[in-house]
């Protein structure tokens, strides 16, 4: 037997052993492939295409029960309300089971909102003159939601506290609002906001970025 044949046989044997051990490779998400439904619990799948930023998947149950064990969506822009200043942006990212938010876009990385009562301004009723929504009700995308609401802090360029930022969880409409200690001005924008780190664990299925883009969430 030639060396080439020996190596080919060895390669085939190793591939068979890897497959038997539950490690598979392919292109695309396994949770969208009917042919993967019958794979045993504990199977590990590597997506060579890194679809939606997910690299490694673990089969956790029967059918299409898969969990991403290594993945990163990268920063994705989130649809915002018109309460934001024109230069401001909101981005979201999921790494593994942790969701991160970023608020900035302005000069020196500041975040800002428009004046109270301005065109498109979206007030938040329970905050009165002191708050507005920056991500609309239902605006947090699937795959990035939290069952529990989260509260962070806002600062005037890091010097003093402006107020709080509130992220409503699945039990409270999946939106984000900001609330200030003082009334939001009616004659000028507030452009020098710094927002504290806002992140949390999620147990939602891995997001489908193409679907979210088509739906206008990102």
Residue ranges of model-derived segments:
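Short, surface-exposed terminal/edge motifs of secreted or surface/virion proteins that either
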Residues: 41-71, 99-101
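Acidic glycine-/aspartate-rich tracts in secreted/extracellular proteins
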Residues: 49-52, 61-65, 105-108, 143-148, ...
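Generic beta-strand structural signal
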Residues: 59-61, 93-94, 167-171
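Surface-exposed ligand/attachment interfaces on beta-rich extracellular proteins
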Residues: 24-39, 70-95, 106-144
């Amino acid at each position: 037997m030639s060396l080439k044949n020996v190596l080919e046989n060895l390669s085939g044997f190793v591939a068979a052993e890897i497959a038997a051990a539950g490690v598979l490779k392919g292109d695309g998400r396994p949770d969208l492939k009917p042919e993967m439904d019958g794979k045993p619990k504990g199977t590990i799948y590597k997506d060579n295409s890194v679809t939606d930023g997910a690299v490694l998947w673990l089969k956790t149950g029967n059918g299409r029960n898969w969990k991403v064990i290594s993945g990163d969506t990268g920063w994705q822009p989130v649809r915002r309300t018109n309460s934001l200043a024109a230069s401001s942006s909101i981005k979201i990212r999921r790494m593994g089971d942790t969701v991160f938010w970023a608020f900035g876009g302005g000069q020196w990385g500041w975040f800002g909102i428009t004046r109270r009562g301005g065109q498109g301004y979206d007030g938040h009723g329970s905050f009165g003159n002191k708050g507005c929504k920056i991500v609309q009700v239902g605006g947090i995308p699937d795959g990035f939601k939290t069952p529990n609401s989260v509260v962070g802090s806002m600062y005037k360029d890091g010097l003093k506290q402006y107020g709080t930022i509130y992220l409503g969880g699945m039990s409270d409409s999946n939106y984000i609002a900001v609330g200030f200690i003082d009334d939001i001005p009616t004659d000028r924008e507030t452009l020098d906001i710094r927002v504290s780190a806002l992140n949390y664990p999620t147990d939602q299925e891995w997001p489908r970025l193409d679907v979210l883009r088509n739906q206008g969430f990102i």
